[in-house]
Amino acid sequence: MSGQELLTFVVYDIEDDRIRARIANACKDYGLERIQYSAFSGPLSATMRGELIARLGDTLGDEVGKILVLPVCEKDLQARREMLNAPPEPGGSRG
């Protein structure tokens, strides 16, 4: 990430399948990667983030739903904690 970009998370809860797909496509168009079913992340400049926010707002329109766009600074990113309990590999053991 360049000094001008911040890691940006987009998380959404949208009932309409068509609108939800268009939101996902918009995130992909801006180079974000899917991290959960309804969550994307990736580096965005303030300008690109503003454009994406406008596009997401236009896409949601008056439909029922919620979209959170969350830029994260490097300091906060370094303080993150991840917890992962992955399922066992098929045919493997949990030794």
Language-model-derived ranges and their functions:
Residues S2-F9, I14-G95:
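Basic nucleic-acid-binding interfaces
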